[in-house]
Swiss-Prot record:
Residues 64-74, 135-144, 204-218, 424-437 have a biased composition (Polar residues). Residues 20-34 have a biased composition (Basic and acidic residues). It comes from Homo sapiens. Endoplasmic reticulum membrane protein that promotes endoplasmic reticulum-associated endosome fission. Localizes to contact sites between the endoplasmic reticulum and endosomes and acts by promoting recruitment of the endoplasmic reticulum to endosome tubules for fission. Endosome membrane fission of early and late endosomes is essential to separate regions destined for lysosomal degradation from carriers to be recycled to the plasma membrane. The lineage of its organism: Eukaryota, Metazoa, Chordata, Craniata, Vertebrata. The gene is TMCC1. The modification Phosphoserine is found at residues 382, 414. Pfam families: Tmemb_cc2. GO terms for cellular component: cytosol; endomembrane system; endoplasmic reticulum membrane; endoplasmic reticulum-endosome membrane contact site; rough endoplasmic reticulum. It is found in: Endoplasmic reticulum membrane. This is Transmembrane and coiled-coil domains protein 1.
Length: 653
């Protein structure tokens, strides 16, 4: 199932980051669409001016048609009609249709048919199939047909005609084309602008038909949007806009924090760390810039959607549209049955002039010649056969309703009609295609009998045509005002778009200025770092050179000391060679002294070895000391003792 218009409004745009080439391509496409819209506006204004010119240059011409022209009418219409039908249908296929225009057409279809006097149940019988006739209006055949009908009708007849089934079939085909055109899946911004333009033009159009009292009126249907869905869509879009605004603020704050952190780290980092920090910061900065750009695109998109919803509203969903279309097509069947009323009443009627009122694609001024019924009655014998013929003609109109749109488009865009009299032709293509042969032939035969009646009713027809011209002028003024409002809306939309682009350019300039300042700060920081590095390198090189110089001086002093020591050793060696003999003698003397000292040491050691056992313990020590003291005492008093001993031993003798 295809998405509705409101569901398309809520779809998020494609958030993928695009390259600059894609953005430039989108800008050029949008500019092309705007230029195309302006060109279409100028063409529509030219069409309105041409219609006003035709209105005020209205002239009525009366001419007769020869039998040769009647035969040429019978032979020529089909190829020209087919060619114009193909061109007009091709033009309609290329024009996008807005759902608002579709609602207008559907409501036009749903208008109940007006029942006139003279309608019988016989006109509602089953309709036999009739050969299809082209509903296209050929310029040449239309003028000749007008001449024949004017020559063959009574002048006393009025121009009160009913809305024809051809117009109803044209409206039904317009509804089908609008339903087929309003179901695309996704559209770009430029396509939505173009669709808005077409829908606004469709709103200014009106389906023109003949009323019961003979006055020409337009049934313009007011396509009012659904207020509840519009309010819900506006609230939803406002919530999304607020959310995106907060996200943009958060992203900008995070980017500013990253910049401050980068500057802080870059000032207190060495060369390698600064390079790594710079790479990380550039990645983060690019990512944050892309995120902010995407969020800004989304915000602009939602602002555009909000303005569109506030201006145009939300149309109904396709389900309701197709249901109303089905009901409208059923009502078309009822309207088709009302065609007999206009045919029966047209016995007394006349043929009035046709003027192109507006460039609208949904309406056309339709008037049926009343003398067709009298001609058919003269051919078939009575008016009872008219409903049967009318039913077959209506079946042909239903089959060829698609070609009727070609007539409307041809009248809208073709400036070949020089005056309103040129446009005064039979717009009911099916009747003209199915009953041209018999009607024209009989009309030519009865043209002489109705000359007096034509002269008597000329004044009434002229007054009626003046009234129609006034009504047409009023409708043209309304259409002009509506078109003026439409172009004012387009102008305001273009100005809003320009303001958005200006705001976007200002934002881009601010971002560019921020990036430029950031790059300048980075360059200044790099210059400062380079200057500090130069100072550090110069100081370190000076310190190292001084250390090397000091080391060289120390090496030189050491080398000089070693040279002096070597010289002193050489001097000592030379003096030693001179005193070699003295040295030998001195050596021998020293050896003798060493030998004496060795003997003494041996003696002392022997005495010590003898004394040591006597002094190992305390008792031995005291005993040894007592013995030494005693020996010393004896040695000191040896003479006395020796004398005493001698006396001791000598006394007994």
């Amino acid at each position: 199932m295809e998405p509705s218009g409101s569901e398309q409004l809520f779809e998020d745009p494609d958030p993928g980051g695009k390259s600059q080439d894609a953005e430039a391509r989108k800008q050029t496409e949008s500019e092309q669409k705007l230029s195309k819209m302006t060109h279409n506006a100028l063409e529509n204004i030219n069409v309105i001016g041409q219609g006003l010119k035709h209105l005020f240059q209205h002239q009525r011409r009366r001419s007769s048609v020869s039998p040769h022209d009647v035969q040429q009418i019978q032979a020529d219409p089909e190829p020209e009609m087919d060619l114009e039908s193909q061109n007009a249908c091709a033009e309609i296929d290329g024009v996008p249709t807005h759902p608002t225009a579709l609602n207008r057409v559907l409501q036009q279809i749903r208008v109940p048919p007006k029942m006139k006097r003279g309608t019988s149940l016989h006109s509602r019988r089953g309709k036999p199939e009739a050969p299809k006739g082209s509903p296209q209006i050929n310029r040449k055949s239309g003028q000749e047909m007008t001449a024949v009908m004017q020559s063959g009708r009574p002048r006393s007849s009025s121009t009160t005609d009913a809305p024809t089934s051809s117009a109803m079939m044209e409206i039904a085909c317009a509804a089908a084309a609008a339903a087929a055109a309003c179901l695309p899946g996704e559209e770009g911004t430029a396509e939505r602008i173009e669709r808005l333009e077409v829908s606004s033009l469709a709103q200014t159009s009106s389906a023109v038909a003949s009323s019961t009292d003979g006055s020409i009126h337009t049934d313009s249907v007011d396509g009012t949007p659904d207020p509840q869905r519009t309010k819900a869509a506006i609230a939803h879009l406002q919530q999304k806009i607020l959310k995106l605004t907060e996200q943009i603020k958060i992203a900008q704050t995070a980017r500013d924090d990253n910049v401050a952190e980068y500057l802080k780290l870059a000032n207190s980092a060495d060369k390698q760390q600064a390079a790594r920090i710079k790479q990380v910061f550039e990645k983060k900065n690019q990512k944050s810039a892309q995120t902010i750009l995407q969020l800004q695109k989304k915000l602009e998109h939602y602002h555009r959607k909000l303005r569109e919803v506030e201006q145009n509203g939300i149309p109904r969903q396709p389900k309701d549209v197709f249901r109303d279309m089905h009901q409208g097509l059923k009502d078309v069947g009822a309207k088709v049955t009302g065609f007999s009323e206009g045919v029966v009443d047209s016995v007394k009627g006349g043929f009035s002039s046709f003027s192109q009122a507006t460039h609208s694609a949904a309406g056309a001024v339709v008037s049926k010649p009343r003398e067709i019924a009298s001609l058919i009655r003269n051919k078939f014998g009575s008016a009872d056969n008219i409903p049967n013929l009318k039913d077959s003609l209506e079946e042909g109109q239903v089959d060829d309703a698609g070609k009727a749109l070609g007539v409307i488009s041809n009248f809208q865009s073709s400036p070949k009609y020089g005056s309103e009299e040129d446009c005064s032709s039979a717009t009911s293509g099916s009747v003209g295609a199915n009953s041209t042969t018999g009607g024209i032939a009989v009309g030519a035969s009865s043209s002489k009998t109705n000359t007096l009646d034509m002269q008597s009713s000329g004044f009434d027809a002229l007054l009626h045509e003046i009234q129609e011209i006034r009504e047409t002028q009023a409708r043209l003024e309304e259409s002009f005002e509506t078109l003026k409002e439409h172009y004012q809306r387009d102008y305001s939309l273009i100005m809003q778009t320009l303001q958005e682009e200006r705001y976007r350019c200002e934002r881009l300039e601010e971002q560019l200025n921020d990036l430029t300042e950031l790059h300048q700060n980075e360059i200044l920081n790099l210059k400062q770092e380079l200057a500090s590095m130069e100072e550090k390198i110069a100081y370190q090189s000076y310190e190292r050179a001084r250390d090397i110089q000091e080391a060289l001086e120390a090496c030189q002093t050491r080398i000089s000391k070693m040279e002096l020591q070597q010289q002193q050793q050489q001097v000592v060696q030379l003096e030693g060679l001179e005193n070699a003999t003295a040295r030998n003698l001195l050596g021998k003397l020293i050896n003798i002294l060493l030998a004496v000292m060795a003997v003494l040491l041996v003696f002392v050691s022997t005495v010590a070895n003898c004394v040591v056992p006597l002094m190992k313990t305390r008792n031995r020590t005291f005993s040894t000391l007592f013995l030494v003291v005693f020996i010393a005492f004896l040695w000191k008093h040896w003479d006395a003792l020796f004398s005493y001993v001698e006396r001791f031993f000598s006394s007994p003798r």
